[in-house]
UniProtKB/Swiss-Prot annotation:
Protein name as it appears in the record: Isopentenyl-diphosphate delta-isomerase
Annotated InterPro entries: Aldolase_TIM, FMN-dep_DH, IPdP_isomerase
Species this protein is from: Staphylococcus aureus (strain MSSA476)
Residues the entry annotates as binding FMN: A65, M66, T67, S95, N124, K186, S211, T216, G262, L263, R264, S283, R284
Gene name of the encoded protein: fni
Family note: Belongs to the IPP isomerase type 2 family.
Enzyme Commission designation: 5.3.3.2
Binding-site positions, substrate: R9, K10, S95, T96, H97, Q154
UniProt key word Zinc-finger: no
Residues engaged in binding Mg(2+): E155
């Protein structure tokens, strides 16, 4: 594939992603908090700091991986980096493979660090990238963490995608052992299982982003790029973010779990934190905001999102993220069926 074709693919991904819409109904709607009428705290008591063994984020919300690798996506990364700088959010760039192949593309990613020199930035590579390239991806952005995306359904629907996956787990293990910053194993919208969590724990992984279905749909994106558009029947493949978080429960004491995929509102973010996530990521909401409404409007959107999270936590009498994990939740029969059939051991306050 030529550099021009790769740039074109990056732009196509963004164009199709922006055209997608949020689900009107999701698994986040299949779980409810129990309301208690009189809180014992005030809004000013709320501490939204997200703390993991290696990373401290001012807020449990981050701009998740989306783009880079073309002139248009450079402009997007520049604007998102300004939003991150002005709001204190962490930010992940999209796959840096384009820059690792062609130094001319490096600036489409490094613009994020240029615009946000003191901020928290995650670099991003695929599970098949050589260890030396993973190290280069971290150095490229002076990144505080490295996302490794695992995206087999996307690759298999992508006309020019990868068809070989046998070496992925061993390669991830090699990267984890060599990279000096936290390595986050990140799905791309298909969710995670307890079996995967077991395998990742065995090779020393300490961070995952479950990225469940319900948000940006890369099966649909790649199917749109197919000549016959003949794989749309896989559109609903995978686990939702709620199901994925439940799948991680037994591993949350050893692995820091981030949640993304289909988060629409501050309430969805709070529900993710209540299910054990340490932070929540969003891609398309930020992309659409900054492209359609500009930087200032997106900054205001983030500030409002954070304030709404504080209001919800006040209603729940939760001073911090850890408190949220003790709050009472009622699940729908469908989610309870998933828990039962998957033999998940769920204990709640």
């Amino acid at each position: 594939m030529s550099d021009f074709q790769r740039e074109q693919r990056k732009n196509e991904h963004v164009e199709i992603a922006m055209a997608q819409s949020d689900a009107m109904y999701s698994d986040f709607d299949k779980m409810r908090f129990v309301h208690h009428s009189i809180p014992s705290i005030n809004v000013n008591d709320i501490d939204l700091t997200s703390q993991t063994p290696d990373l401290t984020m001012a807020y449990p919300v981050y701009i998740n991986a989306m783009t880079g690798g073309s002139e248009w996506t450079k402009n997007i990364n520049e604007k998102l980096a300004v939003v991150a700088r002005e709001t204190g959010l962490a930010m992940a760039v999209g796959s840096t493979h384009a820059a690792l192949r062609n130094p001319r593309m490096a600036e489409t990613f490094t613009i994020a660090r240029k615009m946000n020199p003191e901020g928290m930035i995650f670099s991003n590579v695929g599970a098949d990238v050589p260890v030396e390239k993973a190290l280069e991806a971290v150095e490229l952005l002076e990144a505080q963490a490295l996302q490794i995306h695992v995206n087999s359904p996307q690759e298999l629907v992508m006309p020019e995608g990868n068809r070989e996956f046998v070496t992925w787990l061993d390669n991830i293990a090699s990267i984890v052992s060599r990279v000096s910053v936290p390595v986050i194993i990140k799905e791309v919208g298909f969710g995670m299982s307890k079996e995967l969590m077991h395998d990742l724990q065995q090779i020393g992984v300490k961070y995952v982003d479950v990225s469940g279905k319900g948000g940006t749909n890369f099966v649909d994106i790649e199917n749109e790029r197919r000549a016959n558009k003949d794989m749309d029947y896989l559109s609903s493949w995978g686990q939702s973010t709620v199901e994925s978080l439940l799948e991680t429960t037994a591993y949350q004491s050893e692995i820091s779990v981030f949640a993304s995929g289909g988060l629409r509102t501050p309430l969805d973010a709070i529900k993710s934190l209540a299910l054990g996530a340490k932070a929540t990521g969003m891609s398309r909401p930020f992309l659409n905001q900054v492209e359609n409404n500009g930087i200032a409007h997106t900054v205001a959107y983030v500030e409002s999102f954070i304030e709404h999270m504080k209001s919800i936590m006040t209603m729940l009498d939760a001073k911090n993220i850890d408190d949220l994990t003790q709050k009472q939740i009622v699940f729908s029969p469908e989610i309870l069926s998933w828990i039962e059939q998957r033999s998940l051991n769920i204990h709640r306050g």
